[in-house]
């Protein structure tokens, strides 16, 4: 099998269109994102805590800018037609500026397809790994973050032949397993609350230290719904 990626070449290095937000960011937009990402930092949803911080107000998580994008940051990694193909999201890289978003701000995104490469995979033979960049700025033109997303594009028929149907069944969790999982989650939350407004420096962590793990899941209809509604394109 071959994979015709020639149409992608026409899009590389050229900005693609995007659907801009119609209203400024609100505090509840920021809260919904923190909720969806299971991130218990009071800085992103408690106004009193935010006022006591170095920011003096409630501010967003660093990853929040992608919540305003109508393609969730993936669009520049999907530009171009590959006939008879399917696509998987392959992850992303982030570069953050020391600048946060707060209520009243606007976020804009310039989306530019970056590059692609075709490699042989066990999944589907010739497989296209395509990357695209998102450049997020505020209403002052100041950069907020850069997000580089990767898509995995492959022949649909070839990929379907290699699907492992034994993994289709959903796992079942007992009450005891869920309770133990919640206790593991609380360990990280307690650490975050104990730190408060203090900073954790490099020297505060030593080789061999046992650090609390950040656990979230398992996903459910409720958790997926919470995440879906946090994207501004859905509100």
Model-derived segments and their meaning:
Residues 145-147, 212:
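A structural microfeature
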Residues 90-140, 208:
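Hydrophobic beta-sheet segments that form the core/acyl-binding groove
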């Amino acid at each position: 099998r071959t994979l015709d990626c020639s149409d992608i070449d026409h899009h590389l290095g050229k900005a693609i269109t995007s659907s801009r937000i119609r209203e400024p960011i609100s505090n509840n937009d920021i809260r919904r994102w923190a909720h969806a990402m299971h991130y218990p930092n009071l800085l992103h949803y408690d106004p009193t805590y935010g006022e006591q911080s170095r920011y003096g107000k409630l501010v967003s998580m660093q990853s929040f800018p992608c919540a305003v994008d109508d393609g969730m940051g993936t669009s520049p990694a999907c530009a171009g037609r590959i006939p008879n193909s399917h696509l998987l999201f392959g992850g992303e890289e982030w570069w953050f500026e020391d600048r946060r978003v707060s209520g009243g701000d606007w976020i804009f995104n310039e989306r530019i397809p970056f590059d692609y490469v075709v490699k042989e995979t066990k999944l589907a033979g010739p497989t296209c790994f395509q990357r695209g960049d998102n450049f997020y700025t505020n209403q002052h033109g100041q950069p907020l973050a850069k997000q580089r997303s990767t898509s995995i594009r492959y022949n649909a028929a070839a990929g379907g032949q290699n699907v492992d149907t034994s993994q289709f069944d959903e796992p079942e969790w007992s009450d005891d397993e869920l309770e133990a999982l919640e206790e593991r989650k609380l360990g990280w939350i307690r650490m975050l609350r104990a730190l408060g407004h203090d900073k954790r420096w490099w020297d505060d962590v030593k080789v061999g230290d046992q650090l609390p793990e950040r656990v979230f899941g398992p996903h459910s209809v409720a958790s997926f719904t919470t995440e879906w509604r946090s994207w501004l394109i859905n509100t």
